[in-house]
Each structure stands twice: as C-alpha cells, then as structure tokens.
C-alpha cells in the first residue's frame, strides 16, 4: 500500500490544513497518512476563538519512526507539508524528508510554505519563515507558495507578472524543480491568477474571482493537495496544474453558490476528479532561465 505523508495543521470543524488536503487526495485515489502539527477546534478566523494545541517536534519524529518500524516509509510516494507550529517542527520535517528519501529516492517532497497572514488570523511562530526559506523550500522537489511567500524565498519584491517570472527563476535556481504560485495577486483584480514555473517554461492560469462575504480558509491547502495527487497519478506537470486549478474553482463555486464560509469539499467532491469547467492556460513569452 503506497501513500502520501501529509504533515500540517488540522481542524476538527471545517476544512483547513490536513482537513482540507486529505479528502481530495483520497478522492483522487491515494492513501493518505496524516500527521498533525496542530489540532484546533476550528480555523483561527472565528471571532469566538478556537481551542486546541500544537504538537511537539518529537511527536512528529515518534510517528514517523512508528511508520518506519512497519516498513511503511519505503512505500511513501510523497511528503506534503503545510502549516508548521514551531521552528522545531521544521527540523523534524527535514529529518522526515531525509529518512523517506533514503528509503524511497523516487518519492517527492512538496512544500506549501505557510509563512502566515496576520490580517487573516494566520500567525506563525518565530523562526519558521527563516527555516522555510533556508532549508525546507530549497530541499523540496515542488514548492507551492503564494505571491508573498515566493517574494520571501526569492528575496525580491513582486509587483508585476515580469517580477513574478523573475522570482520563479530565482526559486528554481535554489533547488525546486517546480514552482506553483497558488495565488498571484499582482496580475488582475477581477480574476484569480495562478502561475506554474518549470525549466520548460512559465504558464498562467486565470479564473473568475469569486467575492465572498467571508473568504474561505484552506484554499491553498486544497490546491497543494490536488497538485500533489495529480503528479502522483502520472499527470504531466501541466496537466496537474490544469486539474488543480479547475477542480479548486469547482469547489469554490459551489461554496459561493451556497453562501458558505467553510469550503464545501464534500458536496463538491465530483469536482475533485472531474472538474465541470476548464479554463485556458497561457504560456508566457517572458524568458525563464535556470542555472
């Protein structure tokens, strides 16, 4: 039994972190082995607050060792990481990736480098951004940053599409083979834009921007999980990009139609495997150079 090791946050109610990522990967045909970095009652934007706690780095190490004890790591096809609760957890991620790749060199490491958005109630602990930029992102096969996280990794401001391509160029030169920018907000106000960069080129996808009374949480986690599952199904990088873009829109559209705050992932589950709408992907003519 092959599986995906997903190490990120978890909420009991709603869809964020692992609660947003696990089911889409399962629905696309994969066993998922979740390890939670934090476990909260709900996501942190609720004005009533939340309950729960963060786990320690040793908790991650202990669970990974347990998987190793039953020879599961050699059957791990990918490690997907998202929100980390401490810099020490980032160290545990490094150990985990190294241990998995030692037993299965073909496994992929997909890093969703959550650096926090205080205005959205997402706050990361001190040292996490530095660990992501200096260690986790360079060792990843695939990174799935938003525009801000890409700018931190590339150490440059991103104000235009040309800037974004340059930042992707820098990112690819640092180690990752694929950069998927899950939200590129410098391009258009009335469309939601995503950018894919590989050594073969740069590609832009845009879909209608849906206006919510309260912006759903966990969209980035949904995108990274769909992209991971697509790659593991043997899709080309471009097809995996197309699929995750269109499938995510399908979930968001149903969420919007029902005027819900939490992602309607279960109700929209058919969108995860057969998106009802397909949007064009534009190959950019801007130069993308790799070292």
From Swiss-Prot:
Name of the protein described by the UniProt record: Pyridoxal kinase PdxY
Record gene name = pdxY
Listed under catalytic activity are:
pyridoxal + ATP = pyridoxal 5'-phosphate + ADP + H(+)
Q: Enzyme group, top EC level?
A: transferase
State its Enzyme Commission number(s): 2.7.1.35
The cofactor required is: Mg(2+)
Q: Which family does it belong to?
A: Belongs to the pyridoxine kinase family. PdxY subfamily.
Query: Where does the chain bind substrate?
Result: 9, 44-45, 221
Q: Which organism is it from?
A: Photobacterium profundum (strain SS9)
InterPro entries per UniProt: PM/HMP-P_kinase-1, PyrdxlKinase, Pyridoxal_kinase_PdxY, Ribokinase-like
Q: Which residues bind ATP?
A: 112, 144, 149, 182, 207-210
């Amino acid at each position: 039994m092959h599986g995906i090791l997903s190490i990120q946050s978890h909420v009991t109610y709603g869809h964020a972190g692992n609660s947003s990522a696990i089911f889409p990967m399962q629905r696309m045909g994969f066993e998922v082995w979740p390890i939670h970095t934090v476990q909260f009652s709900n996501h942190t934007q609720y004005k009533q607050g939340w309950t729960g706690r963060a786990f320690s780095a040793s908790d991650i190490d202990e669970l990974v060792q347990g998987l190793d004890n039953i020879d599961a790591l050699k059957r791990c096809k990918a490690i997907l990481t998202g929100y980390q609760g401490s810099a020490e957890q980032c160290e545990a991620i490094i150990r985990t990736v190294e241990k998995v790749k030692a037993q299965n060199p073909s496994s992929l490491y997909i890093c969703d480098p959550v650096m926090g958005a205080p205005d959205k109630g997402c706050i990361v602990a001190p040292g996490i951004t530095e660990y992501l930029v200096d260690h986790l992102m360079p060792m990843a096969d695939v990174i799935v940053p938003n525009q801000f996280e890409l700018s931190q990794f590339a150490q440059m401001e991103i104000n235009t599409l040309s800037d974004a391509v340059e930042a992707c160029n820098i990112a690819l030169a640092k180690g990752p083979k694929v950069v998927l920018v899950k939200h590129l907000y410098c391009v258009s106000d009335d469309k939601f834009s995503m950018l894919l960069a590989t050594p073969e080129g740069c590609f832009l996808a845009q879909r209608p921007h849906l206006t919510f009374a309260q912006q759903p949480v966990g969209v980035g986690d949904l995108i990274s999980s769909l992209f991971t599952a697509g790659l593991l199904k043997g899709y080309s990088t471009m097809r995996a990009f197309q699929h995750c873009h269109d499938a995510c829109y399908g979930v968001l559209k149903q969420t919007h139609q029902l005027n819900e705050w939490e992602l309607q992932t279960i109700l929209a589950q058919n969108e995860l495997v057969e998106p009802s709408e397909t949007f064009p992907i534009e190959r950019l003519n801007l130069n993308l150079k790799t070292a």
